[in-house]
């Protein structure tokens, strides 16, 4: 495309330079990684979302995250994961390359808007089922999301749900003692907090925290900082047995074992009947199933925590079970060897430019 195929428009505090096919640009949100607007695609005749990555080459961390996000969005195709519709830059050469624009499906709201709204069991379990289907699809490619939270789960009025934002995803065959700050604190699994190695069911803890928030209407474990988050986990759910602490590094183990021991609250106290929908006789059984699923997701020791496959087979969500959704053909396994390399920033810029330019070629 030539420069005449693009136009510029200020959206909030950001200038978008987009293809002329996209009109009616309206600001809908922003974050550390980008600014998002809604628009109308005159070619496909549908409303879409356009995300402009903010300064993707300002440092190696931002560049790696942008590279991961683009590669993952290009390879993943599932109804419960946000779909990539277009990828472009107005730059004509690598020297001019500064901005990346990602065109995605447009949803109505993120899950933050849903929390606090009274939902019946059917809607709640259907949202949960879709979230688990999306996670299962990622896990089938060996991808752990690592950053699940209400703000990066989006929904439509018809109750359809999609996961977005993959910048923190990592393959499951790499067991890392990774930074405790990869996940928004409230949804961070215990094994992340204490620096243990972790695998796929780290995402299931996050789902449990989100599910709990949908039911209760408030954050289950609102830690003020890194240490307080661990303390909240043990105060609410109980101090884990000594076998758990044997897996920790000596310094972390020393701290954890020096803290008061807590019995924790019962699941019935944490999730009493009156926080669940209980309008019909059938609701009572669904409430029991919902509480049971929470108890299996929110296990401090990941060895005791339910897997995504087990969660999908649980009575609370299995009423929606569709093999075509649960066992959708997995993408090829994602190779993180590229984005784990430490290379000069200009080489990251080249890689990202190539990802953008090869999208429509």
Curated annotation (Swiss-Prot):
Its cofactor is Mg(2+). Dually phosphorylated on Thr-179 and Tyr-181, which activates the enzyme. Its EC number is 2.7.11.24. A motif (TXY) lies at residues 179-181. Activated by threonine and tyrosine phosphorylation. The modification Phosphothreonine is found at residue 179. This is Stress-activated protein kinase JNK. It comes from Suberites domuncula (Sponge).
């Amino acid at each position: 495309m030539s420069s005449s195929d693009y136009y510029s428009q200020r959206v909030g505090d950001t200038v978008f330079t987009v293809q002329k096919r996209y009109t009616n640009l309206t600001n809908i949100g922003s974050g550390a990684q980008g600014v998002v607007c809604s628009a109308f695609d005159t070619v496909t005749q549908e409303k879409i979302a356009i995300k402009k990555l903010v300064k993707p080459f300002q440092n190696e961390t931002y560049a790696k995250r942008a590279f991961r996000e683009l590669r993952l969005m290009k390879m993943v195709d599932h109804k419960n994961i946000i779909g990539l519709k277009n990828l472009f830059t107005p730059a004509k050469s690598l020297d001019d390359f500064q901005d990346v624009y990602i065109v995605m499906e447009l949803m109505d709201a993120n899950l933050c808007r849903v929390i606090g709204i009274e939902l019946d069991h059917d809607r709640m379990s259907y949202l949960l089922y879709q979230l688990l289907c999306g996670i299962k699809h990622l896990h089938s490619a060996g991808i752990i999301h690592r950053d699940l939270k209400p703000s990066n789960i989006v929904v439509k009025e018809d109750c359809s749900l999609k996961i977005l934002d993959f910048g923190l995803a990592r393959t499951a065959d790499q067991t890392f003692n990774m930074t405790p700050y990869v996940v928004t604190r409230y949804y961070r699994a215990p094994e992340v907090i204490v620096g243990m190695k972790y695998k796929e069911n780290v995402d299931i803890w996050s789902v449990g925290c989100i599910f709990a928030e949908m039911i209760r209407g408030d954050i289950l474990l609102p830690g003020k900082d890194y240490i307080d988050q661990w303390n909240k986990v043990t105060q609410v759910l109980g101090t884990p047995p000594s076998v758990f602490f044997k897996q920790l590094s000596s310094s972390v183990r020393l701290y954890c074992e020096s803290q008061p021991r807590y019995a924790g609250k019962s699941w019935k106290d944490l999730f009493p009947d009156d926080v669940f929908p209980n309008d019909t006789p059938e609701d009572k059984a669904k409430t029991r199933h919902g509480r049971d699923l929470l108890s299996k997701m929110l296990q401090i020791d990941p060895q005791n925590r339910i897997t995504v496959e087990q969660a999908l087979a649980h009575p609370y969500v299995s009423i929606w079970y569709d093999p075509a959704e649960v066992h959708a053909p997995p993408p090829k396994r994602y190779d993180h060897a590229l984005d784990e390399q430490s290379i000069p920033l200009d080489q990251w810029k080249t890689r990202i430019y190539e990802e953008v330019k090869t999208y429509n070629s």
